[in-house]
Structures are given as C-alpha cells and as structure tokens.
Amino acid sequence: MTLDEIKRSIKSGEIKSDTVVIEKGSLTPTSGGLIPYTVFHGWNIASSYECDESWGRSNLELFEYIEKQNFDDKQLEETLASIQTEDHHWNWFKKSVGTTGEDYKWFYLYAEGKPQAACLIYHPKDSALENSNIFYVEFLAVAPWNRSCLVRERKYLGVGSVLLKTALSFSVNNLGLSPGFSLHSLPQASNYYLKLKMVNVENRNKDALLYFELSQLEAKKLLGAT
C-alpha cells in the first residue's frame, strides 16, 4: 500500500487506531476558564495525519495574516523571529509509518476535538546521569496555536508539559523505566527544557542540537513525588 493509498484509507475511515485513553484533565486557556483534555496512547496514523493537516493549515493562515499586515522590515523581522517554526517540516504521518515497533510509544493530547500536542518516545535509553534506563523523546510538538508569537495569542498554556508528564508517568508505571527522560533539543526549545531543570550533557550534543536529560530527582518532582 502506498502512502497516498494509506491517506485515502484514513479519510474513508478504513484504518482503525489502537489508541487507548490514559489520562483526562483540564487545560487553562489564555482567555480564562478550563477546557477538558484527553491523552491517548498508542499508534494512530490517522491522528498523526490530522496533526499534519490541522497544524499545517494553522501555520499557513498565520503567514497569510502576516503578509496582509504591511509590516515594515523591522516589524516583519521581529514578528517572524517570535514564531517557533523549527519543526514545521516534521511529517507526523511519515513518522507513524516508520515507527510501529514496541520500542516506540505514541501519545496524543486532544481538546475540543483537535490534536493539541503529540509526542513520540523511544525506550529503553541509557541515562547519562544515573545507572538506569529511561526513555528518549524522539519528537514532541504542540499545535501552532499553542505557541507564543507577537501576532497571535496562545490558546492553551502548558500543553507540552502536560503531555511530557503523562509520558513520564506511563514510562514508570507501564514500562518499568526509571523516572527521567532525555532528548535532543531544537535551538528555539532549549530555554523551555532549561526551565524544566533538565541538564545539558555536552558529550551527547549533536551539532546545534543540545542533549538534555531530566534527572531522577527532578522527574520525581515533576510527577508530584518528593
């Protein structure tokens, strides 16, 4: 079956997912109040395709809006610099096709019927900080409308952190891994991981991608333990 045939099967509803609900809670919109969310675990190529479609459309709408504003060079430069687009080329559909093994785990966070964030992890991964096995975040992204920029208010706060915490809890309780995780960070995301108190392990950096790991102590704090 070709990729185009798979996409047609997704649209027709022929392809079924094997996801299960592993968490429910509430997100905080920037406009106030609370909105319920659901985190699904499991391989779901339809959800990955939905991420590509809805997130790509959102980015296109944002850039079309910017184009109509007639910004001067300085305003345009500042506006574009405020937009996190380093992962815009990620193709979640193709990532799903290539990651069907048991050593990969998928997580999707939905609210109001839309994918708000997605995460793919690999396990086990040796810890660089402790003598233990943790997981490695292959890819983590939130929807474009959940990112700060100068011309669009972020819709929901803390979506990425919610999904990371859910994946961490799942890895400890269901995969038998030690608390903690690691990843290679895109440059624009490094400050976020530093705020999580992740440690940069320099000998595992890859060119411009810094290697971060969350220690067991900080992971337990993230999970609500002491």
What are these regions (language model features)?
Residues M1-R154, V162, S169-F181, Q188, ...:
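Non-catalytic substrate-recognition and accessory regions of acyl/acetyltransferase enzymes
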Residues L157:
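Mg2+/Mn2+-dependent nuclease catalytic core
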